[in-house]
């Protein structure tokens, strides 16, 4: 509790996996997602992360949120004047919108309807109610409210991978191999497990330049003069 935005959940999962630990991570966030059936946002995008060793150099890291789209992507779209995908947000009147500015004024939609709403609620309980942090819409938005700390709650659960089975490494390897051997739909060369694509992208791009849009470049240039 008494925390703020802690960055990427997957980073912490990677540290646990390096020590041969299975990990589950939950954190709540400022209001962005409306509970199923509500017109007002209350839950955050509330990331959920799971990590496990795989007996290979590529760990299994599932790092996702319960919303249809990351809130940061909506902010980027609003700043750059682009649209967001259909079916991810409602405006303040409860109507579907692809306008990022209207989406920020309205609500984001959870994944899988009422199921995603239930997951968001679960994360709010685990990381907010259980830890003693803010919950039920009380987490402050750092972009809009500077009156005090966010008091976000995080919950980290770690377990030894071989806690119940001494041959976990063999079993997880067999599990992944079984999934990867399934018949594939047309155009799919390999079935990837969570974290695999990220690993490949990182290796491909780790020595390349980072390209940013002209608008972001201008914003950074303006900040330089503000804080120098």
Q: What positions do the PLM features span?
A:
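Small-residue-enriched flexible segments
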Residues: 71-132, 149
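Phosphate/diphosphate-binding glycine-rich loops and adjacent basic-rich segments that engage nucleotide
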Residues: 33-101
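Glycine-rich beta-alpha junction loops
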Residues: 66-69, 115, 161-163
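Short coil/turn connectors at secondary-structure junctions
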Residues: 18-22, 44-47, 55-59, 83-86, ...
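Predominant activation on well-ordered alpha-helical scaffold segments within soluble catalytic domains
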Residues: 14-17, 51, 87, 119-127, ...
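A glycine-rich, acidic short-motif signal
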Residues: 1-58
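Glycine-rich phosphate/pyrophosphate-binding loops
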Residues: 20-35, 126-142
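Catalytic-core signal marking the mid-to-C-terminal active-site face
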Residues: 130, 135-228
């Amino acid at each position: 509790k008494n925390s703020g935005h802690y960055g990427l959940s997957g980073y912490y999962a990677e540290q646990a996996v390096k020590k041969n630990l299975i990990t589950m991570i939950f954190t709540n966030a400022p209001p962005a997602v409306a509970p199923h059936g509500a017109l007002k946002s209350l839950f955050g995008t509330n990331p959920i992360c799971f990590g496990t060793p795989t007996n290979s150099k590529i760990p299994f890291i599932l790092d996702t949120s319960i919303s249809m789209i990351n809130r940061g992507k909506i902010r980027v779209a609003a700043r750059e004047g682009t649209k967001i995908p259909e079916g991810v947000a409602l405006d303040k009147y409860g109507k579907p919108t692809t306008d990022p500015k209207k989406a920020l004024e309205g609500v984001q939609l959870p994944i899988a309807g009422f199921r995603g709403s239930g997951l968001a609620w679960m994360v709010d309980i685990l990381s907010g109610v259980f830890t003693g942090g803010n919950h039920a819409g009380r987490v402050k938005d750092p972009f809009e409210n500077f009156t005090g700390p966010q008091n976000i709650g995080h919950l980290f659960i770690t377990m030894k991978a071989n806690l119940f089975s001494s041959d976990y490494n063999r079993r997880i390897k067999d599990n992944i191999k079984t999934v990867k051997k399934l018949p594939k739909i047309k155009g799919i060369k390999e079935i990837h497990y969570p974290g695999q694509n990220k690993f490949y992208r990182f290796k491909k791009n780790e020595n390349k330049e980072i390209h940013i849009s002209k608008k972001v470049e201008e914003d950074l240039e303006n900040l330089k003069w503000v804080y120098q």
